[in-house]
A protein has these predicted regions:
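Extracytoplasmic cysteine-anchoring/structural motifs
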Residues: 1-180
Length: 180
């Protein structure tokens, strides 16, 4: 029997993305977004008592040539972002549920981690965004026929039972070599 005093405590973190542009004359068409260098598994220990708190033991880094796992936020969606005032929903209708963990942002300004490959080796987190960016009709990234990739440092602490909402503001980013 479940009574009204029983509370459900969610053990995962909910993550949602939205996007807008930095300038009103900018248009972005997003194809894919991935979060790199996140831990992909762990063990959750249930609380010993009904009013207790469980705990996570997050696993080791996945074995891969990229240094860590990645989470796909959107894939093949072709989301159009064309406002610098109203954020466009990317994943609110399909939020991600992830293992609570600390994400260390890619430190682009440091020599030891100034490229994407070095960031992977140090397990520093970033977003990989495949998109087209236009400003006043001129392509800044990609073309009418192709998409380009930008990388954005991404760090936070995902807390169990909490909803984390991120609004991406397109107007910058880095190449895989850490160049703005």
């Amino acid at each position: 029997d479940v009574c009204s005093s029983d509370l459900f405590k969610h053990i995962l973190s909910q993550v949602v993305f939205k996007a807008k542009t930095e300038y009103d004359n900018m248009q972005v068409n997003i194809k894919d977004i991935k979060i790199f260098n996140v831990k992909m598994g762990g063990v959750y220990t249930l609380p010993a008592t009904a009013d207790g708190t469980g705990s996570w033991a997050v696993g080791d880094w996945p074995e891969s040539s990229t240094g860590g796992g990645f989470i796909t936020v959107v894939q093949g969606k072709f989301i159009e972002v064309n406002s610098n005032t109203t954020a466009t929903d990317i994943s609110e209708k399909t939020p991600m549920l992830n293992i609570p963990q600390k994400l260390t942002a890619w430190k682009v300004s440091e020599e030891a981690t100034n490229t994407k490959i070095k960031a992977d080796g140090a397990h520093q987190c970033y977003l990989s965004i495949t998109c087209k960016i236009q400003q006043s009709g001129v392509y800044l990234l990609g073309s009418a026929d192709s998409y380009g990739a930008i990388y954005v440092p991404f760090g936070d602490t995902w807390v169990a039972g909490k909803r984390h909402i991120y609004t991406l503001i397109f107007g910058g980013g880095y190449t895989d070599q850490g160049e703005a």
